[in-house]
Every structure is written in structure tokens, then in C-alpha cells.
Amino acid sequence: MTKEYQDLQHLDNEESDHHQLRKGPPPPQPLLQRLCSGPRLLLLSLGLSLLLLVVVCVIGSQNSQLQEELRGLRETFSNFTASTEAQVKGLSTQGGNVGRKMKSLESQLEKQQKDLSEDHSSLLLHVKQFVSDLRSLSCQMAALQGNGSERTCCPVNWVEHERSCYWFSRSGKAWADADNYCRLEDAHLVVVTSWEEQKFVQHHIGPVNTWMGLHDQNGPWKWVDGTDYETGFKNWRPEQPDDWYGHGLGGGEDCAHFTDDGRWNDDVCQRPYRWVCETELDKASQEPPLL
């Protein structure tokens, strides 16, 4: 029994060897399978781990350098920004100071120009007045040498216009007192006979109530020098003269005066208005005192 089993096993072995010889050598294993088997897989894993570690170290080193460079750039930019802001602020301050200085210089220049213009105007007025006074004095000397028979120029402080001399007061009097003042100067309150004379007088008196030589105290309106009123020049305000009694001063309005716009109005003769004296050039005789 044992021998038979051995024979059978021997036959199986021969059959197996014969079968293997018939099939040929076993096929080679793939490279990946060989690498992943056993110690080779361990070595490959260690190699990859080392490679990854090197890569991580390199990337970390580069990242640290980049962060350091970025930090340096930030500090540089911050310093540059602060420096630029300081410079801009300094320039703004300097610009403001320059602007204020320019404005101050402009104001000083304008003031100097204004003062110079005023000085120039004042100088011209003084020169004009000096020339007028010199001419008047020369005229008066000539009149004295001719025994005062005829005057060819106006006294000092009188203004010549169309062969007449005018004196403009700077204080106020009632109409009758103003009329007496002019008579004492061998003159009369101004008599306006033309639009040209109206403009001349209005220019000198300005917007101030001023007596003229026209009244109706004795009835009809008349000029103090006898000039015909009815046919002569007139420049009344609308609805004037009205001889108004509502002023509460007693009586009506009997004396004429220039108003602030130059037109005429009748008013109470007792009001203290300025006045204008007039005399013909060949009658002017002496200089009145300033009031």
C-alpha cells in the first residue's frame, strides 16, 4: 500500500513536471509590482518622503525670504508714504504762507495805489485851487490899480460860470438871513435862468436842500433880481409849488429851494437850508468869510 502510494505520487510529480515543461517558464512580473513589493516599496517611500521634505524646506525658505522682502517693501512704502505726506503737508503750509503773503502784499499794494490816487487827486485840487487863487489875486490887484471901476474875475472862493460869480455856503440859514447875507456881499440869492445854469448849480450843491432867490411872500412868485418868472426857466417837482400848510410851523410855503435831486420845491422860509449867492462878474467886489 505504501509502495503503491509512492508510485502514484511519483507519477503525479512526473505529470506536474511534464506539465510545467509544456507550459514554459513563468512570465516576468511588472516593474510597478516589483517596485511595490517588499523592501523596494519601503525604499521608494523613504525617497519620496525625503524629496517632499526637501521641497517643503525649499518652499518654506523661499516663503520666508518672500515674507521678509514683503515686510521690507511694506516698511519702505510706509516710510515713503509718511515722508511724502510730510512733504505734501510742508508744501501745503508753505503754499498757505505764500498765499497769505501774496494776499497781504496785494492788500498793501491796493492801499498804496488808493493812497497814491487820493494824494494825486488832492494835489490836483490844490494846484487847481492855487491857480484859481493866483488868478483871482492878480485880478483883484488889477482892479485895485484901476480904482475898482470894473472887475474881470471872481473873488477868492467864488466860482465863475458864464460871466457870473457863485458862492456856495456850507452852513444853513433861514431864507431871509441868507438873502441878507448875499446882499451884504453886493450879490443876491441865485437866480436860475437856464438848464445849463441849473446843472452847474446842482453839480456844486449836491443832494442838499439849498435856498434860491425865488419866493411868493408878497403874492405871485418872483425872482429877487427882477427876472420875469412867468416866461423864465422852471424846474419844479411834480405838483409843486403847493403852498402846503400841514407842516405845523404856521403859514404856508413861500420860499423855493433845490431838493436832493436838484428839482425845485416850495417850503417854509424859516427852515435853515444852505444857500447860493450870485453876482455878475463886473459887480464882484469882495470875498465873503467862510461859514
Curated annotation (Swiss-Prot):
<keyword id="KW-0472">Membrane</keyword>
<feature type="binding site">
    <location>
        <position position="240"/>
    </location>
    <ligand>
        <name>Ca(2+) 3</name>
    </ligand>
</feature>
<keyword id="KW-0106">Calcium</keyword>
<dbReference type="GO" id="GO:0006955">
    <property type="term" value="P:immune response"/>
</dbReference>
<feature type="binding site">
    <location>
        <position position="254"/>
    </location>
    <ligand>
        <name>Ca(2+) 2</name>
    </ligand>
</feature>
<keyword id="KW-0597">Phosphoprotein</keyword>
<dbReference type="GO" id="GO:0006898">
    <property type="term" value="P:receptor-mediated endocytosis"/>
</dbReference>
<feature type="topological domain" description="Cytoplasmic">
    <location>
        <begin position="1"/>
        <end position="40"/>
    </location>
</feature>
<feature type="short sequence motif" description="Endocytosis signal">
    <location>
        <begin position="5"/>
        <end position="8"/>
    </location>
</feature>
<keyword id="KW-0735">Signal-anchor</keyword>
<keyword id="KW-1015">Disulfide bond</keyword>
<dbReference type="InterPro" id="IPR016187">
    <property type="entry name" value="CTDL_fold"/>
</dbReference>
<feature type="coiled-coil region">
    <location>
        <begin position="61"/>
        <end position="123"/>
    </location>
</feature>
<feature type="binding site">
    <location>
        <position position="253"/>
    </location>
    <ligand>
        <name>Ca(2+) 3</name>
    </ligand>
</feature>
<dbReference type="GO" id="GO:0046872">
    <property type="term" value="F:metal ion binding"/>
</dbReference>
<feature type="binding site">
    <location>
        <position position="191"/>
    </location>
    <ligand>
        <name>Ca(2+) 1</name>
    </ligand>
</feature>
<feature type="glycosylation site" description="N-linked (GlcNAc...) asparagine">
    <location>
        <position position="79"/>
    </location>
</feature>
<feature type="binding site">
    <location>
        <position position="278"/>
    </location>
    <ligand>
        <name>Ca(2+) 1</name>
    </ligand>
</feature>
<dbReference type="InterPro" id="IPR018378">
    <property type="entry name" value="C-type_lectin_CS"/>
</dbReference>
<feature type="binding site">
    <location>
        <position position="216"/>
    </location>
    <ligand>
        <name>Ca(2+) 2</name>
    </ligand>
</feature>
<feature type="lipid moiety-binding region" description="S-palmitoyl cysteine">
    <location>
        <position position="36"/>
    </location>
</feature>
<feature type="binding site">
    <location>
        <position position="253"/>
    </location>
    <ligand>
        <name>Ca(2+) 2</name>
    </ligand>
</feature>
<dbReference type="GO" id="GO:0042806">
    <property type="term" value="F:fucose binding"/>
</dbReference>
<feature type="region of interest" description="Disordered">
    <location>
        <begin position="1"/>
        <end position="30"/>
    </location>
</feature>
<dbReference type="GO" id="GO:0005537">
    <property type="term" value="F:D-mannose binding"/>
</dbReference>
<keyword id="KW-0479">Metal-binding</keyword>
<dbReference type="Pfam" id="PF03954">
    <property type="entry name" value="Lectin_N"/>
</dbReference>
<protein>
    <recommendedName>
        <fullName>Asialoglycoprotein receptor 1</fullName>
    </recommendedName>
</protein>
<keyword id="KW-0325">Glycoprotein</keyword>
<feature type="modified residue" description="Phosphoserine">
    <location>
        <position position="16"/>
    </location>
</feature>
<feature type="disulfide bond">
    <location>
        <begin position="182"/>
        <end position="277"/>
    </location>
</feature>
<dbReference type="GO" id="GO:0038187">
    <property type="term" value="F:pattern recognition receptor activity"/>
</dbReference>
<keyword id="KW-0254">Endocytosis</keyword>
<keyword id="KW-0564">Palmitate</keyword>
<keyword id="KW-0430">Lectin</keyword>
<dbReference type="InterPro" id="IPR050111">
    <property type="entry name" value="C-type_lectin/snaclec_domain"/>
</dbReference>
<keyword id="KW-1133">Transmembrane helix</keyword>
<feature type="binding site">
    <location>
        <position position="243"/>
    </location>
    <ligand>
        <name>Ca(2+) 2</name>
    </ligand>
</feature>
<dbReference type="InterPro" id="IPR001304">
    <property type="entry name" value="C-type_lectin-like"/>
</dbReference>
<comment type="subunit">
    <text>Interacts with LASS2.</text>
</comment>
<feature type="binding site">
    <location>
        <position position="265"/>
    </location>
    <ligand>
        <name>Ca(2+) 3</name>
    </ligand>
</feature>
<keyword id="KW-0812">Transmembrane</keyword>
